[in-house]
UniProtKB/Swiss-Prot annotation:
Recorded coiled-coil stretches: none
Gene3D superfamilies: Trypsin-like serine proteases
Site (Required for specificity) residue list: D204
Keyword Metal-binding: no
CDD domains: Tryp_SPc
GO MF terms, alphabetically ordered: serine-type endopeptidase activity
Cysteines paired by S-S bonds: C56-C72, C180-C197, C206-C230
Location of the protein in the cell: Secreted, Extracellular space
Protein name per Swiss-Prot or TrEMBL: Trypsin delta
Catalytic activity: Preferential cleavage: Arg-|-Xaa, Lys-|-Xaa
Principal cellular location given in the protein's record: secreted
Organism for this UniProt entry: Drosophila erecta (Fruit fly)
An example Gene Ontology biological process: proteolysis
Amino acid sequence: MLKFVILLSAVACALGGTIPEGLLPQLDGRIVGGTATTISSFPWQISLQRSGSHSCGGSIYTDRVIVTAAHCLQSVSTSSLQIRAGSSYWNSGGVTVKVSSFKNHEGYSARTMVNDIAVIRLSSSLSFSSTIKSISLASSNPPNGAAASVSGWGTQSSGSNSIPSQLQYVNVNIVSQSRCASSTYGYGSDIRDTMICAAASGKDACQGDSGGPLVSGGVLVGVVSWGQGCAYSNYPGVYASVADLRAWVVRNA
């Protein structure tokens, strides 16, 4: 899912992250193999913006707290950040709210991408509606093969510079942590305890979808984190596992 190839290392460096073993986090992009959708189908989705431009995705946890990826918030000032909620378009509609503070997981590592989760506190509360809703955190990981969806405004191909204005989504299937780390796929020991994977042929999240929601069974099960390319065969998208990091989110929200 959110994946850069090595040629995009300059982008990651510009955004303040280091790259784990040639596998890059996605910082600006589109859903690969996806379909345009509306925010009413994914009302917990927000666009995290730096200086008014889409940077990453995120999920509404409470009316004042957003869950996103820690790698989205490296070397960035709070004053440059805002979120847009309640719109199918990252650049218009809905509401924009300034960020008052954020906290990255203390155990986050840009080298290994372990604990890639963060919470954002908003300067004012969101008003919930049909297009702005919170989503519950998973308390356990879904089984291997479970149906899931991922949404965002990320690039639609690996290495692309352009992003769509309208929200995109793809349906994927969960790949359990143990299976994702097995010889079936190409990651091996790069898959850690706080990660979960998802895949579908020709479909994935990509640059710019980072921090966005992986949803299964109506709850947030993953946060778009990293991967090898976008929709590359043998390399599922890798997500921060919300069930494994739930206690940290609740404690810091």
